[in-house]
């Protein structure tokens, strides 16, 4: 009976009538989380967290375990789908002013940070060349922290270099953080239902709402079927599209890859890190590239919530999207001119968006007041 009541309550959940397709990505992320946990469990059953056996265990999963290739590809490509959905979800939040639901936005940003940490630890687990060197470069950034940096790095590595204890720790952290994500995700959804959804107009939704079921349910199911179709098409026909060729070789500490880079979904942050020729400055910029999202609810000065009616901010928003793409592209290139200059200009524009947000809001208010 309690389950039936829950279903009835969920079906009767009041939702704004005018929410568009951009509001579907939240439920897509819930589906992605479920798939990642499920496929991750089956991979963990066969995986061995040992530097001599990790790479071989991944080969064993893909070759010998029934449907192991599918589990491995679903988990790896599923992570890329996860980040595509989450970046669209964040962009929608910025565009339509969803960040004004402070608790929901802050819990969501914390969730993003935890998700990025989990994905990073997971990328190290296959113990390929790029896994090893990406781990070396990124964890080395901790040494930039004054006084505590070296101690923290040694503690994280479990020694004075990346070795077997590091892989064991990363495996344990990747496993435990997924449960942290589920907990924080539940909190995020609860806070969302407390504050209520925003809508494309940025107005109060209370005056015009409909039950979640059937309209929104079918809308979500349609989107989910399209996402699953895209995922299965990629897994079946282009399983290695997001993989780095270097990662098909076992980790070798004596051979450095020509160009060290993380997965594509971290390239924007990595590009910002590389654009600053100072270790501490780069590490701070890397942290700020994500942390700056936390400032959005506190720097909103416009009397209008959504960018639907803010043409100047729309221009700034699409500049941010283009900048994100440019930083991602430049991070795949060698550290040499003109790519370093492009990265530096793009990184400056990236941070400028969230600095310009309050200034443009204030300017818009003045224009509307005098018109």
Curated annotation (Swiss-Prot):
Heme b b562 binds at residues 75, 174. Binds 2 heme b groups non-covalently. It comes from the Eukaryota. It is found in: Mitochondrion inner membrane. Keywords: Electron transport, Heme, Iron, Membrane, Metal-binding, Mitochondrion, Mitochondrion inner membrane, Respiratory chain, Transmembrane, Transmembrane helix, Transport, Ubiquinone. A ubiquinone binds at residue 193. Its cofactor is heme b. GO terms for cellular component: mitochondrial inner membrane; respiratory chain complex III. It is a multi-pass membrane protein. Component of the ubiquinol-cytochrome c reductase complex (complex III or cytochrome b-c1 complex) that is part of the mitochondrial respiratory chain. The b-c1 complex mediates electron transfer from ubiquinol to cytochrome c. Contributes to the generation of a proton gradient across the mitochondrial membrane that is then used for ATP synthesis. Heme 1 (or BL or b562) is low-potential and absorbs at about 562 nm, and heme 2 (or BH or b566) is high-potential and absorbs at about 566 nm. The cytochrome bc1 complex contains 3 respiratory subunits (MT-CYB, CYC1 and UQCRFS1), 2 core proteins (UQCRC1 and UQCRC2) and probably 6 low-molecular weight proteins. This is Cytochrome b. It comes from Eryx elegans (Central Asian sand boa). The gene is MT-CYB.
